[in-house]
Amino acid sequence: MTRVKRGYVARRRRKNLFTLTSGFRGTHSKLFRTANQQGMRALVASYRGRVGRKKTLRRLWIVRINAAVRSDGISYNKLIQYLYKNQILLNRKILAQIAILDRFAFFLIIRSIQREEG
C-alpha cells in the first residue's frame, strides 16, 4: 500500500481558516474546531448583511423619490406606473440620484407625467 503524505493539505486548510478568524476573541481564533464554527457563522452573517444592504438601499431610494415627487403633487406610485407605461428605463437608484443631484431634470420627468395625465 502506498504512503499518503497529506500534511501540507491539512496545514494549508487550517492556515486559511485561521487567517479568516484572525481578529476573533479567545479560542475563536486559536482552536480549529471553534474557529471553524465561528468562521462559518461569520460568512453567513456577512452574506445576510449584503442581502440586507440591498433591501435597505432600495427602501431609501423609494423614500427619496417619494419625497421629491410629492413636493410636486404626484404620488410615487403614479411616477413608477408612468415610467413603465412609457418604457422609460430609469431604475430607482438612478431616479433617486437625479432627484437629489439634478432637481431640474427630475422635475422635467414629472412635468411630462402631468402633461400626459391632463
From Swiss-Prot:
Q: Where in the cell is it found?
A: Plastid
User: Would I find Ribonucleoprotein among this entry's keywords?
Assistant: yes
Claim: Plastid is one of the keywords in the record:
yes
GO:BP terms for this protein? translation
Keyword entries, A-Z? Plastid, Ribonucleoprotein, Ribosomal protein, RNA-binding, rRNA-binding
Q: Which CDD domains does the record cross-reference, listed alphabetically? A: Ribosomal_L20 (cd07026)
Q: Name one GO cellular component term.
A: ribonucleoprotein complex
Function, please?
Binds directly to 23S ribosomal RNA and is necessary for the in vitro assembly process of the 50S ribosomal subunit. It is not involved in the protein synthesizing functions of that subunit.
The UniProt similarity line reads: Belongs to the bacterial ribosomal protein bL20 family.
The name this protein carries in UniProt is Large ribosomal subunit protein bL20c
